[in-house]
């Protein structure tokens, strides 16, 4: 079975910015990949928070140039919230894959075993995150869109313009 491919159709300041296509490593991180895939399709309905378990309409709330672009907080929208398809949080699956360079897709967390829905896309090699954050996919198309998102970031992570996932889903 091949790894699933999902997409984000991005908007910057309300304007279409292009599509990011990601391959999810279901072969090495099946639970983490399934969580992200289902949050892209929205197929699990409404979560415990009362919000849809869906990335559509959520933002990239933290973007740091030459580091990463972080999103996935569809409960609070500011980096304080997150919910997985398994409940509030789930354990680190494994650290087989590494943060080897631009385009790596990894889970954001607040310490061991605190994965929810927040994720980040690396814009550089970030080896200091190995063993702390679960790598579960990579960008296979649209890295130029990630670079455009990176341009509205700052050292603090605050974006100069809103970066939104206008639509998302599964391709294969």
From Swiss-Prot:
Keywords carried by this UniProt record: Cytoplasm, Isomerase, Rotamase
Entry GO terms, CC: cytoplasm
Domain PPIase cyclophilin-type: 7-170
Enzyme class: isomerase
Catalytic reaction annotation: [protein]-peptidylproline (omega=180) = [protein]-peptidylproline (omega=0)
Compartments, as annotated in UniProt: Cytoplasm
Inhibition and activation profile: Binds cyclosporin A (CsA). CsA mediates some of its effects via an inhibitory action on PPIase.
GO annotation terms (biological process): protein folding
The enzyme's E.C. designation: 5.2.1.8
GO molecular function: cyclosporin A binding; peptidyl-prolyl cis-trans isomerase activity
Tissue: Expressed in meristematic tissues, with higher levels in nodules.
Name of a matching Pfam family: Pro_isomerase
Family (UniProt): Belongs to the cyclophilin-type PPIase family.
Function: PPIases accelerate the folding of proteins. It catalyzes the cis-trans isomerization of proline imidic peptide bonds in oligopeptides.
Name of the protein in its database record: Peptidyl-prolyl cis-trans isomerase
